[in-house]
């Protein structure tokens, strides 16, 4: 896992160049949003159980067939596994928010997910929907906290990255 600064430095080191204005602007943006990213992650961390519970409740109210016999969350064990996965996506999203970089999502969440879900016959649409719902819940929680988030993309980028990558996969 690398943060924004490490990625920039590695890129310039590999080419043997000094940091240019573009690199300095990216680093400045990263540093200027550091406190906001920390505040967002602090809210997510303190509300994680609520976020997961609400995301699951909304997803299952939209797709009740998942809880019926034959559904992918029908047994207690399968339901618990679904909640575990939702927590997993949320936790790694917070890592990406802090890092200001989505690479960890590729390394630890998205790579290999297609094969795993295919082997378990897990449909991807409910997963994508749960990630969308979590993003909505977090935006609502942030607005309740009256935080002055200058860049809404701080919250959206990791969730949108997961949604886009999962939606592109033919599962």
UniProtKB/Swiss-Prot annotation:
SUPFAM superfamilies per the UniProt record, alphabetical: Globin-like
UniProt record, GO biological process: photosynthesis
Annotated keywords: Antenna complex, Bile pigment, Chloroplast, Chromophore, Electron transport, Membrane, Methylation, Photosynthesis, Phycobilisome, Plastid, Thylakoid, Transport
CDD domains xrefs: APC_beta
Disulfide bridge positions per record: none
Keyword DNA repair: no
N4-methylasparagine, modified sites: 72
InterPro entries for this protein: Allophycocyanin_b, Globin-like_sf, Phycobilisome_asu/bsu, Phycobilisome_asu/bsu_sf
Domain of life: Eukaryota
Pfam families per record: Phycobilisome
Function: Light-harvesting photosynthetic bile pigment-protein from the phycobiliprotein complex. Allophycocyanin has a maximum absorption at approximately 650 nanometers.
Quaternary assembly: Heterodimer of an alpha and a beta chain.
Protein's name according to its UniProt entry: Allophycocyanin subunit beta-18
């Amino acid at each position: 896992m690398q943060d924004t600064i490490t990625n920039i430095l590695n890129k310039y080191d590999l080419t043997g160049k000094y940091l240019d204005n573009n690199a300095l602007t990216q680093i400045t943006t990263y540093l200027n949003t550091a406190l906001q990213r920390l505040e967002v992650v602090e809210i997510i961390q303190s509300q994680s159980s609520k976020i997961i519970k609400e995301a699951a409740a909304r997803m299952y109210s939209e797709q009740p067939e998942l809880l019926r016999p034959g559904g992918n969350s029908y047994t207690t064990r399968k339901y618990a596994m679904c909640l575990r996965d939702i927590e997993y996506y949320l936790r790694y999203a917070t890592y990406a928010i802090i890092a200001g970089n989505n690479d960890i999502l590729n390394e630890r969440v998205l790579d290999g997910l297609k094969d795993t879900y295919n082997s378990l016959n897990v449909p991807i649409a409910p997963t994508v929907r749960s990630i969308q719902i979590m993003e909505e819940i977090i935006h609502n929680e942030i607005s309740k906290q009256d935080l002055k988030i200058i860049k809404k993309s701080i919250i959206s980028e990791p969730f949108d990255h997961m949604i886009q990558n999962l939606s592109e996969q033919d599962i």
